[in-house]
C-alpha cells in the first residue's frame, strides 16, 4: 500500500488541512471520552513542529446537513484541544471562502456535516476544502470507509494529499495482522449477530488458524453443532452458514457457559456444562473452563485479532470470560490488534490498553478493512501517490 506520508513532507510555511476523527461523545458541553482526541494530538503537534499553518476538521454526531446545531458543535473539542495543546484553538464556523492562518498557528473548523454536500461528496464543496490548503492530510481512519467531502473529495482536488501518522499506523498494523501474519493466528469475533459480521467471519476463516466466537454469534455456532441454546439470542436461519464457516477453519466451541433466566443487571448467574442448558436459559458468557481453554490457545498464538467481548461484560457476573481472554491477550507475546467500540470499552474496563500491540480507532472502518473491502479515503490517497 503506497501513500504519501505527512511525516515525509516539508510543511514549513505550508497551509495544512488535517481531517481527524474527533467524533467524541459530548454531554452538557463536556467531552465524555477523549480517546480519539488523544490519538490525534501527536499528529497536530508534529504539524506545528514542522512549521505549518494548521487547520483541523472533523464531523461530530449526525446533524441535519447544512444546518448548525449546538449539540453537534465542536466547541467542547476546541476547548479540550486548547487545554491539551496549551494554546488557544479558535473554532471557526465561517471558513469555506478562505481563512487567515499563520505558520505555527492551529485552528479548528466547525463540524463538516454543517456543510451542504459533505455526505454526498459534492465536487463543489470538496474544491472549496482543497482551495484552503497546500497539503491535505487524511488522518481519520474511523471515517476512511466513507467517501465524503472531507475524507475523499478534498483528496481528489488538493495540490498534495497524504496520510497522517495515525492513519499510516492503522494501515501498517492491520497489514501486519492480515496480509502476512505470524502464525499461528487466532481471531476472536464476538457480537450479537452472525449476520452483521458474516463478511468478517468469512474473511478471517481464510486467514486465521483458530476462530474463537462469542456472544450471540457463538450461540448460532453452538446450535449448528447440535447443542441446545435455550432462549439465547441466535439466528436459526444462519445455522447452515455457521456450519460452512466451521468447515473452513477451527472454531473451538464452549464446553461450559454462564446462563441466567433473564437479561438484567440483577440476573443470577449459573455456570453449566453446555449439555445442561435448559429451555428457559439464556447464555450470557462463556464458562470458566472454556475461558481457560481459550486463554491457552491465545498463549500459543503469534498473531491475535480481537473484535468483540465474549459475554455481557457490562454486567460483572457475565464478564469473567471477557476478562480472562483480555488478560490472556495482554499477557501474550503475540502481535495483538483490537478494534470495535465494545472491545475498546472492555480494554478500558480491564485496564490493559498499554499491553495490546495496536488498538484501532475505527469501528466500521476496522471491520471493512478486515472484510477485505477497499476503503475509499485510502484508495484515493494511493491514486494520488501514483501521480
From Swiss-Prot:
* Gene designation per UniProt: pgk
Keywords assigned: ATP-binding, Cytoplasm, Glycolysis, Kinase, Nucleotide-binding, Transferase
UniProt GO BP: gluconeogenesis; glycolytic process
| Broadest EC class assigned to this enzyme | transferase
Q: Which SUPFAM superfamilies match?
A: Phosphoglycerate kinase (SSF53748)
Hey, which pathway is this one from? Answer: Carbohydrate degradation; glycolysis; pyruvate from D-glyceraldehyde 3-phosphate: step 2/5
Q: Where does ATP bind?
A: 197, 314, 340-343
Q: Where does substrate bind?
A: 21-23, 36, 59-62, 113, 146
Protein name according to UniProt: Phosphoglycerate kinase
Query: Which catalysed reactions does the entry list for this protein?
Result: (2R)-3-phosphoglycerate + ATP = (2R)-3-phospho-glyceroyl phosphate + ADP
Question: E.C. number, please?
Answer: 2.7.2.3
- Superkingdom of the source? Bacteria
Pfam families associated with the record: PGK
Q: Where in the cell is it found?
A: Cytoplasm
Q: Which GO terms describe its molecular function?
A: ADP binding; ATP binding; phosphoglycerate kinase activity
Give the family from UniProt. Answer: Belongs to the phosphoglycerate kinase family.
Supply the InterPro entries for this chain.
Phosphoglycerate_kinase, Phosphoglycerate_kinase_CS, Phosphoglycerate_kinase_N, Phosphoglycerate_kinase_sf
The annotated subunit structure for this chain is: Monomer.
Any one cellular component term from GO for this entry? cytosol
Amino acid at each position: 500500500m503506497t501513500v504519501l506520508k505527512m511525516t515525509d513532507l516539508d510543511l514549513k510555511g505550508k497551509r495544512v488541512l488535517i481531517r481527524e476523527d474527533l467524533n467524541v461523545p459530548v454531554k452538557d458541553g463536556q467531552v465524555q471520552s477523549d480517546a480519539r482526541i488523544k490519538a490525534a494530538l501527536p499528529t497536530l503537534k508534529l504539524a506545528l513542529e514542522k512549521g505549518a499553518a494548521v487547520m483541523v476538521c472533523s464531523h461530530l454526531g449526525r446533524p441535519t446537513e447544512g444546518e448548525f446545531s449546538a449539540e453537534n458543535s465542536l466547541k467542547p473539542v476546541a476547548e479540550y484541544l486548547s487545554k491539551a495543546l496549551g494554546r488557544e484553538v479558535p473554532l471557526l464556523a465561517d471558513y469555506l471562502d478562505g481563512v487567515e492562518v499563520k505558520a505555527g498557528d492551529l485552528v479548528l473548523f466547525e463540524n463538516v456535516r454543517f456543510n451542504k454536500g459533505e455526505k454526498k461528496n459534492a465536487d463543489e464543496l470538496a474544491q472549496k476544502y482543497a482551495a484552503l490548503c497546500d497539503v491535505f492530510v487524511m488522518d481519520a481512519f474511523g471515517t476512511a470507509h466513507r467517501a465524503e467531502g472531507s475524507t475523499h473529495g478534498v483528496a481528489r482536488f488538493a495540490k498534495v494529499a497524504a496520510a497522517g501518522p495515525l492513519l499510516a499506523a492503522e494501515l501498517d498494523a492491520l497489514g501486519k495482522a492480515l496480509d502476512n501474519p505470524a502464525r499461528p493466528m487466532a481471531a476472536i469475533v464476538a457480537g450479537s449477530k452472525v449476520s452483521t459480521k458474516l463478511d468478517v467471519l468469512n474473511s478471517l476463516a481464510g486467514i486465521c488458524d483458530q476462530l474463537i466466537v462469542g456472544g450471540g454469534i457463538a450461540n448460532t455456532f453452538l446450535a449448528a453443532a447440535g447443542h441446545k441454546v435455550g432462549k439465547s439470542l441466535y439466528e436459526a436461519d444462519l445455522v447452515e452458514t455457521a456450519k460452512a464457516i466451521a468447515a473452513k477453519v477451527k472454531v473451538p466451541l464452549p464446553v461450559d457457559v454462564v446462563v441466567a433466566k433473564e437479561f438484567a443487571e440483577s440476573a443470577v448467574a449459573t455456570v453449566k456444562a453446555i449439555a445442561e442448558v435448559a429451555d428457559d436459559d439464556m447464555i450470557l458468557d462463556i464458562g470458566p473452563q472454556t475461558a481457560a481453554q481459550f486463554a491457552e490457545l491465545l498463549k500459543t498464538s503469534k498473531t491475535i485479532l480481537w473484535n468483540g467481548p465474549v459475554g455481557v461484560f457490562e454486567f460483572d457476573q457475565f464478564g469473567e470470560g471477557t476478562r480472562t481472554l483480555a488478560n490472556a491477550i495482554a499477557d501474550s507475546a503475540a502481535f495483538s490488534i483490537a478494534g470495535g467500540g465494545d472491545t475498546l470499552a472492555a480494554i478500558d474496563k480491564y485496564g490493559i490498553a498499554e499491553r495490546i500491540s495496536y488498538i484501532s480507532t475505527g469501528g466500521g472502518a476496522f471491520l471493512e478493512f478486515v472484510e477485505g473491502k477497499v476503503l475509499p479515503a485510502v484508495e484515493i490517497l494511493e491514486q494520488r501517490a501514483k501521480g
